[in-house]
């Protein structure tokens, strides 16, 4: 059964490159990014894991923990990490799950029904501190994930979780936001002291509230 936005992220206990981890316990009160790759020693995923390791500080300042998953065994992960560190000039600094029994892949619907049952699709799940799924993305094998976009989405999710706003197309942190349609004009004046710019009754902008 496919997971939907707002569903509780399935918990699991997994063997990882950083030891055995209970996923929900490991997350604690943090946000989480869980992303899968189809197999170790694949070229696109090699660049992706390297990219994530280089921006770990960006995830940390947003209170986000990152974990990767594939169905390959732990020894394979460890050998692949050496290649990633060498070719991407990085040091892998987050856990990679060895999901040999496909427990995680099945729980998160990462096995494409028309694909080899060994391969996971390249999915991304963003999970809130409440353990609810906030976003899902699935990429084709030929297209590397854009982690700048994933950080941008996290910024939007965290902002809109604490303020009655939405973020418009191509929004980036610090830019104007949209006042939620459920907020009346009088309430908006109280909630957003930086001011309101009303374009249409349903389209009202306000400077980004402070997090």
Describe each PLM feature range.
Residues 1-211:
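Chalcogenol-based redox active-site neighborhoods
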């Amino acid at each position: 059964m496919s997971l939907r936005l707002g569903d509780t992220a399935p918990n699991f206990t997994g063997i990882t490159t950083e030891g055995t981890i209970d996923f929900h316990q490991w997350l604690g009160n943090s946000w989480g990014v869980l992303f899968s790759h189809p197999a170790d020693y694949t070229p696109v995923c090699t660049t992706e894991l390297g990219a994530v390791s280089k921006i770990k500080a960006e995830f940390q300042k947003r209170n986000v923990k990152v974990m990767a998953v594939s169905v390959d065994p732990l020894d394979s992960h460890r050998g692949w990490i050496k290649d990633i560190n060498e070719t991407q000039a990085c040091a892998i600094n987050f856990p990679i799950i060895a999901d040999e029994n496909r427990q995680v892949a099945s729980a998160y619907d990462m096995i494409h029904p028309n694909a080899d049952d060994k391969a996971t699709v390249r999915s991304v799940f963003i999970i809130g501190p409440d353990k609810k799924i906030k976003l899902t993305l699935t990429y084709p094998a030929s297209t590397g994930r854009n982690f700048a976009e994933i950080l941008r989405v996290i910024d939007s999710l965290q902002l809109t979780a604490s303020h009655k706003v939405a973020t418009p197309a191509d929004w980036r942190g610090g830019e104007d936001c949209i006042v939620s349609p459920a907020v009346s004009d009088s309430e908006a004046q109280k909630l957003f002291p930086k001011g309101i710019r009303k374009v249409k009754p349903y389209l009202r902008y306000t400077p980004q509230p402070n997090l």
